Amino acid sequence: MLEGFKKFSQHNFERDVLNQKGLTVIDFWSESCVPCRQLAKILKQLVQEVPDSVTIGSVKVEDNIELLERFNIRTTPTLLFIKDGELVETRTGVDRRQVIKKLVETYA
């Protein structure tokens, strides 16, 4: 869904998210989720505005059940903010661009 963004899965999550320094924002999305498409548009705008040290990526929930269970994700879209391997914020639903940008600035 998020072309050009890092695609995370249960196979690379540990290496590419939890073992990395800096902030990673992960969008958990589903193909059948209309609000997920709205959030994807917001994230596409934000990727141009955030520092290079921030990684924005996505996880397709249908293919990554283990990650859903690990992070207790019950709805899509869900955004996880992970800083230096630690979960610092979880957001569900579609927030305004300014809200997400402020969270990125807070944790980056």
Regions found by a protein language model. Give the residues of each.
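Alpha/beta-hydrolase fold active-site loops
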Residues: 23-24, 77
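Thiol-based oxidoreductase modules, predominantly thioredoxin-like and allied folds used
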Residues: 5-8, 28, 40-47, 51-66
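Short pre-active-site segment immediately N-terminal to redox-active cysteine/selenocysteine motifs
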Residues: 29-32, 75
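Short, thiol/selenol-centered motifs that function as redox-active sites or metal-ligating centers
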Residues: 32-39
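Structural cue for short, hydrophobic secondary-structure segments
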Residues: 27-29, 81
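N-proximal helix/coil linker or "cap" segments that precede and/or mark the start of modular domains
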Residues: 1-3
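A short beta-strand-turn-helix
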Residues: 5-23
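Non-catalytic, surface beta->alpha helical segment in thiol-disulfide oxidoreductase systems
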Residues: 75, 81-108
